[in-house]
Regions:
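Surface-exposed coil/turn segments at beta-strand junctions on protein surfaces, enriched
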Residues: 56, 68-70, 100, 110-112
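Short, well-structured beta-strand segments within conserved domains
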Residues: 61-63, 73-77, 111-121
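Generic beta-strand/beta-sheet core signal
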Residues: 66, 78-80, 89-91, 120-122
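Structural motif
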Residues: 85, 114-116, 145
Length: 266
């Protein structure tokens, strides 16, 4: 029930997205940047492009183009960095295209007429590591960050957030579907237990974790005592801490009613 700057930014985002769904060079080239249901109507150039999709719930994106200009429209669609391939059907015919140097698939010159274009960027699981720690990773599926569901009660500070323990480097063996769209779960690699994974944007009203520490069995046998001792020390310090104030961050300074001027900082 708070209204912080984060909430305002979250609301503002949607307006910003609308600014960038499409780009046009003012002539006959149109770029599709984002996959968001929308209608682009350009009376001056005599074409209308409708985009229909529930992405990322589904990877199917439909474009309905009504092109009435005598000059052909050059249509380019962004191929996301996370997509290994992207199927393209124009009026039911499959086309193969490679992205250009800017990462866009050129559908070619579309003459006057109506077109039904379907694209399906392939979404798959992969990991992304912290810049300073290659063994602290996040799980991603296409553009989505997956969060581990830790329940409504505060997890145990030592063992509530699992580590990943396996010698198997094949990510597809770590995670399996969990019965619903965009729902996954760890598969025998969580220590002390596996957890369910869901898109971060759908995770609320519970505790969660996004980053996971990964160990091989040999690394864990060497570091287990050290790792658990560090977590125990952090938990004990937190239990003894009355307050924690991060100077230089807006929200903590407001929470602590800090009054300062430019002379207050060194």
């Amino acid at each position: 029930n708070t209204f912080t700057c984060c909430v305002g930014s979250g609301i503002e985002n949607h307006g910003k997205y609308a600014e960038q769904i499409y780009s046009h060079d003012g002539k006959n080239t149109l770029w599709v940047n984002l996959f968001i249901p929308s209608v682009l109507n350009d009376p001056a150039n005599k074409w209308v492009l409708r985009q229909e999709t529930d992405f990322p719930e589904s990877n199917r994106i439909l474009f309905l183009l009504d092109q009435k200009n005598k000059e052909a429209l050059n249509l380019k669609i962004r191929m996301p960095y996370w997509a290994k391939r992207m199927d393209i059907l124009i009026d039911g015919v499959m086309y193969k295209r490679l992205p250009d140097s800017s990462g866009y698939l050129n559908l070619g010159s579309l003459a006057r007429g109506k077109y039904r274009i379907v694209i399906e960027p392939e979404m798959e699981l992969y990991t992304e590591a912290m810049p300073d720690n290659k063994n602290r990773i996040a799980f991603k599926y296409g553009p989505l960050v997956l969060a581990g569901q830790l329940g409504k009660n505060m997890p145990d500070p030592l063992y509530g957030t699992p580590v990943l323990l396996t010698d198997n480097k094949n990510l597809k063996d770590w995670i399996r579907p969990a019965g619903g769209p965009l729902q996954f779960e760890l598969n025998g690699v969580g220590k002390p237990n596996d957890v369910k994974l869901a898109p971060f944007y759908k995770t609320y009203d519970q505790f969660y974790s996004v980053y996971w520490d990964y160990f091989t069995n040999e690394e864990w046998s060497r570091r287990q005592n050290e790792y658990e001792a560090a977590k125990k020390m952090a938990a004990e310090l937190e239990a003894r801490t009355i307050d924690y104030f991060r100077i230089g961050e807006m929200q903590p300074e407001r929470d602590h009613q800090l009054v300062a001027s430019e002379k207050s900082y060194v």
